[in-house]
């Protein structure tokens, strides 16, 4: 069987616009260096809801809810070249995006 290499990149961010811009940068960089790209695939958004009391002592019926959404994208780079890996390492992405890379 042939040696199949792929790089799997998972992106996470609270702001979906910044996340999509980062994903487009990665896809464009990989395609420019000659690798095949699959994605970006939108993964389910995590939604965390936090409920707190509005008043410091009593009034238990008065509560406030806050939510935090974590948007995720998945990009697979198939048949990466050394040039692709080098270009991805030098890529400058925004600070609000978390990146996980698996080889």
From Swiss-Prot:
PROSITE patterns, sorted: RIBOSOMAL_S10 (PS00361)
SUPFAM superfamilies reported for this sequence: Ribosomal protein S10 (SSF54999)
Any Pfam family matching the protein: Ribosomal_S10
Keywords: Ribonucleoprotein, Ribosomal protein
Gene3D superfamilies: Ribosomal protein S10 domain (3.30.70.600)
Highest taxon in the source lineage: Bacteria
InterPro entries: Ribosomal_uS10, Ribosomal_uS10_CS, Ribosomal_uS10_dom, Ribosomal_uS10_dom_sf
Sample GO molecular function, one term: structural constituent of ribosome
UniProt-listed GO biological process terms: translation
GO cellular component terms given for this protein: ribonucleoprotein complex; ribosome
Subunit structure: Part of the 30S ribosomal subunit.
UniProt xrefs under HAMAP family: Ribosomal_uS10
Family: Belongs to the universal ribosomal protein uS10 family.
Biological function: Involved in the binding of tRNA to the ribosomes.
UniProt protein name: Small ribosomal subunit protein uS10
